[in-house]
Amino acid sequence: IAEKYPQGCFDMIFADPPYFLSNGGITCQSGRVASVNKGGWDKSQGIEKNHAFNTEWLKLCQQVLKPNGTIWVTGTMHVIYSIGFAMQQLGFKMLNDIIWEKPNPPPNLACRYFTHSTEIVLWAAQSIKSKHCFNYEAMKNQNDGKQMKSVWRIKPPGANEKFFGKHPTQKPIELLKRCIEASTNEGD
């Protein structure tokens, strides 16, 4: 897709890459046992190959970002550390790690670890030299006049948000709206 666009054309990118979790496991969705297999695209090829994949798609994103553009990337503990490391290797300027807290996560069926109730959203600028956009006052206004913190409590998307089918890891509109409002200006 990146080849269709000229270099430096986007002010912001929101990426939801594979989490590499399709491993034959199960979860609970709407009170029913469900497979976690999303498809071959989400199956791990091993740590090194997964990291190479993350580095490659991030390179493409970096090329199409404007010099002052930013990227938001979501992930769980299974993939986000590789992504953050790849971003640092590529020279992105790390701005924040947002913790998206889900108030109603699926239950922990294995009972061998804490319930996964968060995802991490990394926010980074195109390079160390970037003078990125941050709409500080707008974020403060959304938080009753207080500075917006890096823990965001947002419900996962409901059925009313799933207009175009059922993407297995669809993000809530409120999450994307906040990212867009924080890091872009009207008309971008």
Predicted regions and their residues:
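Core catalytic lobe of class I
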Residues: 1-188
